[in-house]
């Protein structure tokens, strides 16, 4: 639905780029933006792979929100997922201006909070940027986690200040 894009525009962002590999998701985002902000030209949408987009886009950003689909649904692909998170965040660190804010998320059940943090920290170290955690995010209270099923804590996120 483009929720992050919607709220970025609502928060007076000068320019919002929405990127999703799904053209249907991009179409829905564009319809939502047009419905709520008719004629507003601050939004640009790209039906493209985010990795490719970050490689080719020359812009630098003050704020980046990474909210990819689940990179791993089974433990056998956990290492590939962690490499994907590291790579995606490394590309974001390259594109964010000093003093920028990065919101980064994982909704993969099999990726623990600690493994996600380590993948992001590895990306930060690789980028050579000094990064501070401003806030750690998790799923809301309407998605409770059963103590006998810790994998139910599927959503994790970090809000990072990038120097």
Predicted regions and their residues:
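Conserved SAM-binding motif I beta-strand of class I
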Residues: 15-20
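S-adenosyl-L-methionine
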Residues: 22-65, 71
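Conserved SAM-binding loop of SAM-dependent methyltransferases across substrates and taxa
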Residues: 3-14
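Helix-to-beta-strand junctions that scaffold the AdoMet/dcAdoMet cofactor pocket
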Residues: 96-98
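Amphipathic, non-transmembrane alpha-helical secondary structure
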Residues: 6, 55, 86, 90-93
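Mobile active-site "lid"/loop adjacent to the S-adenosyl-L-methionine
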Residues: 61-91
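C-terminal catalytic and target-recognition region of SAM-dependent MTase-like enzymes
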Residues: 101-163
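Class I SAM-dependent methyltransferase "Motif I" SAM/SAH-binding loop
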Residues: 1-3, 107
